[in-house]
Every structure is written in structure tokens, then in C-alpha cells.
């Protein structure tokens, strides 16, 4: 039992290894059969489930917890830590997500194994499983934020799996934007908590953002902030959690008219992000407990935030159309410019060296290098401006 708990980090590395195998198989033109790759993937998922079950028995039935931290990024007065934290909450979510991920992979194999890009689907599912495990074993809110970003990327890739489908592409873009809004808001909350922990409490060690110290951090922030400001901050925390709950509903609004098996897999995967929202709510519960009867004001602020988001959403669609037109114009202009340069250099080589293949290739490469240099210079100047 202790072996599984001491090596619980394998819950992160094993799905990543499967992703590497699937990615390498794509580089060698999918020479490995789908059945073999699925066998590897489901075996790893079952091994991870065994680790999660052992951790569940260790923390729930034996009433024990495990915590480890190591410095990852050190600044002048701020240190960021990564590590592992297992308690009753984390192991419960690990076990639940492990069971659901195994069922999802089995369903995808039974129903979608004849899909030409099934290996890519399997890669995205393992990437999502890796990120979900990372959220649940994180010892602090900063590490959870990092894995929330990976969850957002995996969700975008899965929704946009059939990128030739315009409905799926629209759903992927909207899901990605909503994820970025939620994750950037979470980053704001992380930096706010870190500011109060470091500046006012002089916490520069692993306790500054640790879940084990969240009660003290919440009480300290509540005492330092004014009452309206604390209500607003808790409203932002609740906004982040609600955005995670809305992930499945966002996909439902853009779900394709044909209810395919792939859309069911994607919907089930998006619904699993709700687990991450529940987990975040339980970890940040000390802030909501300290609100007391100010919950009414929190709900009012939350409603105003979503009203603002709805207005921005109405403006977002025309903005996307405009940016799509600009992007198309820029891409076509660059392609035409590149073609013009290559033709010019090929003409020069025919005049100077009789147009043999080697000279044509050399001058074409020179033209491409000049194009890349032009784009790079333009990009640098644009940043400076």
C-alpha cells in the first residue's frame, strides 16, 4: 500500500508516456495497430486506477494524509512550489475521475475504433486524464491553475477533433475563450492570495498558497480587506467555479445537429470538468464560510458579472468574423509575396546558371529565408510599437 502512495506521481507520468507513444506512432505513419495502442492506454488507465484506489484506502480508511513540496520558481520575495497532496478530498476525486476515464476510453474504443483518427482521439483523452489528475493531487492553488490551463487545451482539442466540421470548430473556439476567461480570473485570484500572504503575513514558503493553510489565509484576507472588497473577491472565486460548471453547457449550445457518437464522447469529457469545479469549491470553501450572511451580495455581484459576460459574448461573434477576414487577407498576402519572391529567384537562377535543379533549390531557399527574416523584423517592430 505504501508503495502506491509514495509513487503517486506516476498518475501524472503514465498518461504522459501513453501520449508520447501515440505521438511517436503518428510520426511513423501509424504503424502500430489501434488495438495494440488501446491495450496500452487502457492498461495504463487501470494501473492509475489501482494507484488511486490504494491512495483512497490510505487516506479514507486509515485517516492519513501525504504532503510533499519542492521549490519550482524562486523570485526575490516570492517562491512557487510544486508537489503532491493527498487527503480524503483529493483521493476521492482521483478515484472517481479514474473510473470515469476508464469507462470513457472503453466506450470510445467500442464505438469509434473504426474512425481513421482514433489514435489522435486516444491521445487527447490521455492528455485530459493527465491534467485532471494533476489538479486533484496539487498541494496549492498555483499548481492547480497550471493544470487547469492544460485541461482547457485538452478540452479544446477534443471539441475540435473533427476540425472540418464548422459547428465543432465554433464550439471549440467558444469553449477555449470561456476557459481562458475562467482561468485568467483564477490567475487573478491566485496572485491576490499570494500578495496578501507575502506582503502582510510574510509567508514566502510553501504555506503561502497551500490548501492545508487555506483557513488561515482566508481569515487573514478577510481581516485585511474591507467587507465590500472581500465580497467582491469571493464573487470572483465563485465566478471561476461556475465557469467550470458551465463547460458542458457551453458545448451543448453548439452541439452539432447530428447527435454522433463522437459528440457523446466530447460531451461526457466536458461534463467531467464539473468534477474540477466541485473540487475547487471544496478547496476554497474557507473563503465562502467567512462570507456569512454576505452571500446575498455575492450572488448579486455574480449575476452582474455574467450579465457583462453575456453582453461581451454578443460582441464576440462579429469580432471573430472581422478577425477571420483580416487573418485570411494577411495569410493570402504572405503566400502571394512568398510566391513572387520564389519566382523572382528562380528567374535569376535561370539567367545566371541555366536553371538547373540545384540552383533553383538554392535560390528558392534563399528566398524563403528572406521571407522569414522579413516577417521576423516586422513582428519585432510591431511589438516595439
Residue ranges of model-derived segments:
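Membrane-entry segments of alpha-helical transmembrane domains in multi-pass membrane proteins
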Residues: 1-13, 34-39, 79-96, 134-147, ...
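Transmembrane helix-loop-helix hairpins at membrane boundaries of multipass inner-membrane proteins
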Residues: 1-10, 20, 24-123, 197-224, ...
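Central hydrophobic cores of alpha-helical transmembrane segments in multi-pass inner-membrane proteins
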Residues: 10-28, 41-54, 97-110, 128-129, ...
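Alpha-helical multi-pass transmembrane bundles of energy-transducing inner-membrane proteins
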Residues: 32, 124-221, 309-310, 314
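Alpha-helical transmembrane segments and their helix-start/interface "positive-inside/aromatic belt" motifs
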Residues: 33-47, 173-185, 359-365
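Juxtamembrane/interfacial segments at transmembrane-helix boundaries in multi-pass membrane proteins
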Residues: 56-83, 150, 164, 168, ...
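Internal transmembrane alpha-helices of multipass membrane proteins
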Residues: 66-163, 182-184, 256-260, 264, ...
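Aromatic-capped, Gly/Pro-kinked transmembrane alpha-helices
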Residues: 77, 269, 311-385
Amino acid at each position: 500500500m505504501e508503495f502506491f502512495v509514495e509513487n503517486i506521481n506516476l498518475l501524472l507520468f503514465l498518461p504522459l508516456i501513453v501520449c508520447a507513444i501515440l505521438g511517436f506512432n503518428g510520426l511513423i505513419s501509424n504503424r502500430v495497430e489501434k488495438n495494440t495502442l488501446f491495450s496500452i492506454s487502457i492498461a495504463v488507465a487501470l494501473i492509475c486506477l489501482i494507484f488511486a484506489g490504494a491512495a483512497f484506502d490510505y487516506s479514507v480508511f486509515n485517516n492519513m494524509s501525504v504532503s510533499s513540496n519542492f521549490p519550482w520558481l524562486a523570485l526575490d520575495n516570492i517562491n512557487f512550489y510544486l508537489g503532491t497532496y493527498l487527503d480524503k478530498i483529493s483521493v476521492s476525486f482521483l478515484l472517481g475521475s479514474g473510473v470515469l476515464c476508464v469507462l470513457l476510453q472503453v466506450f470510445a474504443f467500442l464505438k469509434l475504433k473504426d474512425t481513421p483518427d482514433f489514435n489522435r482521439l486516444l491521445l487527447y483523452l490521455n492528455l485530459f486524464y493527465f491534467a485532471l489528475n494533476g489538479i486533484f493531487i496539487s498541494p496549492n492553488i498555483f499548481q492547480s491553475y497550471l493544470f487547469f490551463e492544460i485541461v482547457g487545451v485538452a478540452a479544446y482539442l477534443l471539441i475540435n477533433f473533427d476540425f472540418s466540421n464548422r459547428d465543432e470548430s465554433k464550439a471549440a473556439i467558444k469553449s477555449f475563450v470561456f476557459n481562458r476567461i475562467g482561468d485568467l480570473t483564477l490567475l487573478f485570484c491566485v496572485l491576490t492570495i499570494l500578495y496578501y500572504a507575502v506582503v502582510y503575513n510574510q509567508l514566502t514558503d510553501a504555506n503561502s498558497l497551500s490548501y492545508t493553510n487555506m483557513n488561515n489565509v482566508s481569515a487573514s484576507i478577510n481581516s485585511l480587506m474591507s467587507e465590500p472588497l472581500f465580497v467582491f473577491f469571493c464573487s470572483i472565486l465563485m465566478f471561476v467555479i461556475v465557469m467550470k460548471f458551465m463547460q458542458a453547457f457551453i458545448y451543448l449550445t453548439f452541439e452539432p445537429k447530428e447527435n454522433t457518437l463522437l459528440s457523446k464522447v466530447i460531451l461526457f469529457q466536458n461534463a467531467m470538468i464539473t468534477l474540477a469545479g466541485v473540487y475547487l469549491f471544496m478547496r476554497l470553501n474557507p473563503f465562502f464560510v467567512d462570507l456569512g450572511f454576505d452571500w446575498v451580495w455575492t450572488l448579486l455581484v455574480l449575476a452582474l458579472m455574467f450579465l457583462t459576460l453575456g453582453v461581451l459574448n454578443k460582441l464576440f461573434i462579429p469580432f471573430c468574423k472581422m478577425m477571420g477576414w483580416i487573418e485570411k487577407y494577411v495569410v493570402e498576402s504572405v503566400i502571394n509575396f512568398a510566391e513572387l519572391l520564389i519566382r523572382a529567384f528562380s528567374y535569376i537562377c535561370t539567367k545566371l546558371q541555366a536553371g538547373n535543379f540545384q540552383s533553383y533549390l538554392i535560390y528558392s531557399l534563399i528566398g524563403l529565408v528572406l521571407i522569414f527574416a522579413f516577417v521576423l523584423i516586422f513582428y519585432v517592430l510591431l511589438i516595439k510599437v
